[in-house]
Amino acid sequence: MTHTSSSTSSAFGPSTVTITNCGARRAFPSHARRVFVNDSNMVAMMLSIGAGDQIVAATGIKGQTDALAKVYGHRAVSALPDSDGSYPTLEQVLGARPDVMLAGYGYGYGESTHLTPEELRARGISAYVLSESCRAKSDDKARGVMDPWTALRSDLSNLGAVTGHTQEARKVVKDIDTRRRALARAPQASTKPTVLMVDSGDTGSVFTSGRYGGPEVIIKAAGAVSATTDVANTWTTISWEKIAQTRPDVIVFNDYPGQTKAQKVALLEANPATKNLPAVKNRRFVNIAYPAWTSSPLNVDAAETLRQSLEKYRMVPASGIKPRHDVTARG
């Protein structure tokens, strides 16, 4: 990732940095002090690089503070200015007077609420878009234009430059890469198990993640194959009938308010399309916290946790890999 610093005066003040975000070169403050962050995965990015005290508002983190505290500590998480449990409005963002807004399409930005990068830029606020949520075309609602690990590395590098924590960001990226290499060196199954991510669902469809979402690379890093690897999107809805064709060996749940693990299991066991799937019949389920599934530094913790679970279910050989952090959830 190439960053270009400038000491010339601009709308951002005397010091700016030019970064590439969603394929576009844009100027940002090089030492942003007031960052409005939406969603727990992006809060995790900021905390991981030591920029927590530069968060002026944090929204959309209701129900995820315990998961964040397990990794970043209760003191750091309790100090977050939790403005609201819900996603922000344009008025709320403007009222916080941020230098930078950190959000994504489907993660706070949306045309229906008029909270868009374009609207913020028109009002003098630098708008950063979560790379996982980048759109291939401005009028295309499908998200995802790059490999999820590449998206995460890009965001950490960019946010390091914008907040003045470049070295810290490099250390986080290096640590993730080291742990990924350890997972890649682990012994593999002769036939890799198929894993399905279930965020939520009803009798007709499941909200899940395609090949541009974090679960794709998490599942792959753990030594398995994603049941939705052929879906060209990040987070999206597909039919249970399509899922049933993949015959998943293990089902992983995204622990997220609105539908408990028990409710998801009951749905799977009652649905004719899923009740006889290997994962359901053998009750091979793994429940992991939301910030570890969505694009964040915790993705590697999710991969280590899933690897351990696959070994427990005898889906892959023993490796000796242990999760560094506990990102499981009771549900």
Where on the chain are the PLM-derived regions?
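Bacterial Sec-exported substrate-binding components of ABC uptake systems
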Residues: 1-45, 158-198, 313-331
